[in-house]
């Protein structure tokens, strides 16, 4: 018989319990690795895939190309079911996707702070500690972040949060310069335009800086997560490894704010300062946060 994914019959539902089907798919993967040198695969609607197939795919790819990444699209549920040592390396973090734009639009940073702590916090019950989920502010299936945010001053802040939080940051093409696009009820054409040429701007430069800072920070790439200061308009959290400690501070408000907390102590370097304007600051229980700002403070 013939089935389609969720009633879409142009998207055939394959029988992944049929050895011949599995062998064919693995041959396709092998071709793409050997002919084109791809480094990984994104598995669409991974929550629908047979678990034994994902186990077979994982072992096959690891033997063929060590370090090959398998990332699944998952919208809901427990990500641990498929992101583990036997199946996928990562999956899309839709819980925090929603939390990012909603926190800014509602001016309630408690929402994203709660989600991040629930997923990656210091307590043993936190559900995704040690995992690297794919994080994003938009993609080919949802309205672009520049069209969702009600205050455009929050656009760079959303990217600052994206690159400061745990996970694997993913940027959708065009959004690095703030392209807008609203998902229609019956099609996604507005989300997937053909650009004649790039449109780099200040947001692009800021994202490039975020990428460089994160790439060179073990704490931002691999560190633990812990909330330090939370208000409706401000959030300070800590990323830490044995060798590095970074405070990520976000002020979504339209005025300067001074955060007070006994943990805001010591000497820090502002990682997002320009190379010729490296700023060293000493905290004595307080941090002054400019309006609409993102700060990455590395303990020295």
Where in the sequence are the language-model features?
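Substrate-binding/active-site clefts of carbohydrate-active enzymes
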Residues: 1-35, 57-63, 80
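The substrate-binding groove and active-site-proximal loops of carbohydrate-active enzymes
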Residues: 7-22, 39-48, 103, 141-151, ...
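Soluble or luminal CAZymes and related metallo-dependent hydrolases
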Residues: 17-25, 49, 53, 108, ...
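Conserved, mostly hydrophobic/aromatic
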Residues: 25, 32, 43, 70, ...
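Active-site-proximal helices and loops of the catalytic beta/alpha 8
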Residues: 28, 34, 44-128, 161, ...
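Structural preference for beta-strand elements that scaffold enzyme active sites
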Residues: 38-42, 67-71, 132-135, 169-170
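Carbohydrate-interacting/catalytic domains
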Residues: 86-88, 155, 166, 171, ...
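Substrate-binding clefts and catalytic carboxylate motifs of secreted carbohydrate-active enzymes
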Residues: 113-183, 198-202, 235
């Amino acid at each position: 018989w013939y089935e389609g994914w969720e009633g879409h019959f142009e998207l055939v539902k394959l029988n992944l319990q049929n050895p011949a089907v599995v062998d064919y798919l693995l041959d396709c993967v092998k071709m793409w690795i050997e002919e084109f040198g791809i480094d990984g695969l994104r598995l669409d609607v991974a929550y629908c895939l047979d678990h034994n197939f994902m186990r077979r795919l994982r072992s096959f790819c690891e033997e063929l190309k060590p370090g090959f990444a398998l990332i699944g699209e998952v919208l809901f549920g427990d990500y641990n079911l498929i992101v583990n040592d036997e199946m996928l390396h990562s999956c899309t973090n839709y819980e925090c996707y929603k939390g990012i734009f909603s926190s800014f639009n509602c001016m309630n940073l408690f929402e994203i702070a709660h989600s991040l702590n629930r997923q990656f916090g210091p307590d043993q019950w936190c559900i995704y500690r040690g995992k690297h989920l794919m994080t994003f502010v938009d993609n080919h299936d949802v309205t672009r972040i520049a069209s969702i945010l009600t205050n455009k001053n929050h656009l760079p802040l959303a990217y600052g949060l994206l690159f400061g939080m745990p996970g694997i940051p993913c940027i959708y093409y065009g959004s690095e310069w703030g392209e807008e696009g609203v998902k229609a009820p019956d099609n996604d054409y507005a989300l997937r335009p053909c650009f004649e040429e790039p449109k780099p701007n200040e947001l692009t430069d800021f994202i490039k800086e975020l990428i460089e800072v994160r790439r060179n920070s073990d704490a931002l790439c691999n560190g633990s997560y812990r909330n330090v200061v939370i208000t409706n308009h401000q959030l300070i959290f800590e990323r830490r490894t044995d060798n590095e400690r970074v405070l990520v501070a976000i002020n979504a408000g339209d005025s300067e704010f001074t955060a007070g907390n006994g943990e805001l102590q010591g000497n820090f370097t502002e990682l997002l300062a320009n190379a010729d304007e490296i700023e060293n600051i000493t905290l004595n229980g307080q941090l002054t946060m400019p309006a609409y700002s993102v700060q990455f403070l590395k303990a020295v």
